[in-house]
């Protein structure tokens, strides 16, 4: 099939936090599904080091298999990742508490579809700013949406409340995810769609000043 869009440039980085022995992030770098849509994803493991690392790897591997074997949809990929996590949990007791966040992007001809569970984020770069396209599944965001506490009051406890996930990919809970569907024309700038996926370790830096300059990445 003729590819509708070309992948011009890809960059990625990931490293464990100082308090972690292993890296709990896994990435699916941009690639094409069987219908020439562009797919990429990020997963950030939750919980103990061994199960967190394995859970995020398992979720990304499940998406990779889905890409190669059948018509891809974000919903089917999320369901396949959930099945893979459930199987991992059943196979080995040491992975019984396996859980991960998962954010998947599918760039179609006319739309960008994002499937989202947890607190990783999808951004688009427009006018030298990063615009957040997903909403965190955290206690902080939940309280913010409820509007019963002031933003100032919530901000005092932001770090603690942001670490409490309200949704994750795990056998312990029913699959529950957000689907974001955005016309691609709303995201493209000067003929380019510039998107980023980030786990909390990365976006905690950007949210302080989500703007690019000529020296941002120096």
Identify what each model region corresponds to.
Residues 1-218:
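PP2C/PPM-type serine/threonine phosphatase catalytic domain
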